[in-house]
Structures are given as C-alpha cells and as structure tokens.
C-alpha cells in the first residue's frame, strides 16, 4: 500500500490483492500488468492466481484512519490500482469480505472503489441502502460501448458515484448503432484523461472539451488528470484544458459532520 499516492485525485492507494482479467479496450495497455511483470508476476488472465498480502499490509489503512481522525480531516483511498475489487474470481471471496470489514472499521477513510464490473457490485457488497458514508463507487468508461456502466452506477446508493474516463478513446456523447451517449444524471464526479505510456493511443482534445462541458452543465465535479498522447501536450500543461487546470472534487461529508448531525 502507498500511504501517500502520486495519483492526483486521491491521497493514498490500497490494493487488497493484485491481478484481474482484462475486459475492455481500456485494458489493452494496462499499467498494472506492466508494473506487476517488473516483479515477475503474471496475474492478468482468469486462470492465474492473484497475488495476496499479509496482515501487516492490511493494518496500514487502520493506521491511516487514526491519523485522519487525529487531524480531523478524512483521507481518500483509491482501491484498487492493481486489481478490480468486483472481479468474479474464485480466490477473492474471502479477501473481499475482509475488505468490507476494513472499510467499516475506517470511517475516516473515503474508499474510492473503481470497477469495470458494475454488474457485480450489488451482489458482492454486504450493505443495503444506505451504504456506509465513506464508500465511493466509480466505473471506467472509455467510449460509448461502455456508457451502460453509468446506468448501473446510478442504481448504487453510494455517497459519491464517479466515472473514470481515462483513457478516453472516443467521444462519449456521439451516438452510434446500439450505443448510447453518456448521461451524467446521478453522477457526482468525472475523472478524465488521455492514455499515457510508450504505446499510448491519442486522445482528441475535443472529446475532453465536450466531457468538461457536460460536467459543467450538469453540476458534476470535473477532474482532468492528463491530456495523455494528444499532440498538444506540453510538459506542465499536461492537465490544462483551454488555459484552466481542472481539479474539482465532489462534496462529501466527514465523520465529524455526521456525528454532529446525529447529535
């Protein structure tokens, strides 16, 4: 676990395990696979075992929770950068239950759960309506073939529902046969970005502009992570769109404010 993350839209990352099966075009140049292979791990097919961690690893979020409570300020935790928590892999039932218990034990951590498998979420989480206030749920959407994930996301009673449009591989608003434009009703936050890395696919800046415009029109927080492989990218301007650096975050309650309301 990284107690402090280099990912701009979170504070820390926690991976209950490593590995998952690729399920869509966004997975083609998976950075997590590349990273794992550096350490000799081949984890990205359904027949491979996942990589698991010991008790010391699982205690780190408890330490972070104590620090956040002492500071009176919640911390955002991205889960998982090296896996998909909602993958239906036979080895994952037990560690997934351990994760739910950990989330419930750390109310000062805002758990940012990002998945490409929203169809599995309702069955796998142990909570009814409402969910714990510190659970955020997000889906990855790279083109209009996967805008259905936003429809499934809207059905989930999370404090924050978000979309990760990174990498953006096409317009998310141009209708095509059997595909629907993205709708942002019921969504609180959008993270957008082009693909990075040596084999990155180019992102048209117009796709990012129309996504930003839709967020502004719908009152959705917009966070631009990077332009990625777009030819207009210039060093420090990698996350600047039309002269503005977009780093908006969604509104969310802290445990302290919830306690005050209950009192």
Description of each model-found segment:
Residues 4, 10, 48, 75-76, ...:
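Homeobox/homeodomain signature
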């Amino acid at each position: 676990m990284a107690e402090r993350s280099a990912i701009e839209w979170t504070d820390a990352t926690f991976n209950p395990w490593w590995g998952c099966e690729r399920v869509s075009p966004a997975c083609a140049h998976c950075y997590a696979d590349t990273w794992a292979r550096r350490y000799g791990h081949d984890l990205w097919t359904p027949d491979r075992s996942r990589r698991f961690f010991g008790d010391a690893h699982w205690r780190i979020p408890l330490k972070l929770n104590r620090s956040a409570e002492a500071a009176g300020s919640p911390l955002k935790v991205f889960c998982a950068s090296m896996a998909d928590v909602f993958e239906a892999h036979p080895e994952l039932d037990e560690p997934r239950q351990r994760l739910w218990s950990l989330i419930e034990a750390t109310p000062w951590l805002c758990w940012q759960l990002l998945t490409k498998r929203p169809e599995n979420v309702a069955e796998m989480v142990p909570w009814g309506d409402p969910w714990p206030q510190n659970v955020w749920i997000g889906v990855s959407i790279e083109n209009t073939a996967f805008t259905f994930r936003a429809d499934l996301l809207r059905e989930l009673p999370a404090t924050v529902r978000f979309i990760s449009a990174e990498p953006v591989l096409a317009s998310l608003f141009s209708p095509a046969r059997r595909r629907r434009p993205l709708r942002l009703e019921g969504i609180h936050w959008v993270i957008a970005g082009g693909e990075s890395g040596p084999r990155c696919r180019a992102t048209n800046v117009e796709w990012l502009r129309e996504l930003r415009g839709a967020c502004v029109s719908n009152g959705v927080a917009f966070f631009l992570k990077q332009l990625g492989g777009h030819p207009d990218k210039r060093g420090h301007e990698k996350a600047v769109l039309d002269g503005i650096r977009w780093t908006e975050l969604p509104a969310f309650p802290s445990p302290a404010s919830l306690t005050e309301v209950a009192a």
